[in-house]
Curated annotation (Swiss-Prot):
Pathway assignment: Purine metabolism; AMP biosynthesis via de novo pathway; AMP from IMP: step 1/2
Active site per the UniProt annotation: 13, 41
Top EC class for this record: ligase
Enzyme Commission (EC) number: 6.3.4.4
Binding site for substrate: 298-304
Entry's cofactor comment: Binds 1 Mg(2+) ion per subunit.
Protein name, as recorded: Adenylosuccinate synthetase
Lineage: Bacteria, Bacillati, Cyanobacteriota, Cyanophyceae, Oscillatoriophycideae
Gene designation per UniProt: purA
Amino acid sequence: MANVIVIGAQWGDEGKGKITDLLSKSADVVVRYQGGVNAGHTVVVEGKIFKLHLIPSGILYPDTDCIIGSGTVIDPKVIIEELDQVEALGISTANLMISGAAHVTMPYHRMIDKASEKRRGSKKIGTTGRGIGPTYADKSERTGIRMIDLVNPDRLKEQINWTVNYKNVILEKLYDLSPLNPEEVVNEYLNFADRLRPHVIDASLKIYNAIQLKRNILFEGAQGTLLDLDHGTYPYVTSSNPVAGGACVGTGVGPTMIDRVIGVAKAYTTRVGEGPFPTEAKDEIGDLLCDRGAEFGTTTGRKRRCGWFDAVIGRYAVRINGMDCMAITKLDVLDGLEEIKVCVAYDMEGKRCEDFPGSAIQLSKCKPIYKTLPGWKESTVDCRNLEDLPKQALDYLRFLAELMNVPIAIVSLGASRHQTIVVEDPIHGPKRGLLYS
């Protein structure tokens, strides 16, 4: 039995969906612990592409329970669309469960999110406009509506009538927007409730019971370490905690019940939206990585900013998350390059810095210090064992592992499940502190 957290080690979009899908075959339960429809993951199975935002990747395995935890925020319309999408492919959704403590994204959240971002002007954050931040803000203000309220008609009507009237003042007076009709919102969300009611449970208790039964549980994070509200490049972050610690808070599971943490990082670096990005390549290399890697957001469709691998970020993610091992994705994107650069440290106003700085302002002053490695001509997409990889590709992976002081357990060479090298069982080994071998 193992309880394992999968986290993003960069700015999100690292390929967590594929890695979680790969590991889900060994899991009895897959749990999503934070975020909302602002994060998307793509899974390719037998040529079929699944693009999901809220439903855990484990839904593709009929014997796996899928739980959406209390740390998430739920857009009922979107999750119903995803249920329809999955069911249309002949996949049962009876194994999907949603925490009654998860908060609900409402129409006014989306309106405020978009209007607020527009109002920021040059100081915009790069929000997806899906209402995530305002939903979490209401959670903190203790004015939010939870899933347990959604499925209670009388409670839902009472909360919506009060909250919509309150939010209308903000919409009209602050943002010059048209007010919402409380009755229309009530009717819309009552319909959502009818569809979602069978899925709403006490998720913390469900997970605890699974742990007592010694079932294998996979905790699936959204976004990445550097988008964490507390530990990311604030204010260019999300409104929740994607780091490993967020899994405990976002599911109601004690930290002593977690056995392992697996990080996921691309063989290069990307980010979406605003904020400092030391290794960003604003030249033909950046364009090449974007084109080869199909670097466009699952949620927004926005082009991702691309650059070389940043080992300073990698070391930080290993430390913050207590990472046991790492999966490196999209190694194949680097095929054919004459040389490959890796950021080993920063130059911060003339001083060498090997540790990630504590603020976005400091990070914006950092310039990458690169180590240049030889590339490889051969294609890696059909490699299924380490021995199949070009020597230079193997050396590259070893170099990354040594820089970050973390073993690499999985290497992904494409979007499909079979395009993967499993170096060692990422759930039961290797142990933290060992290097790539």
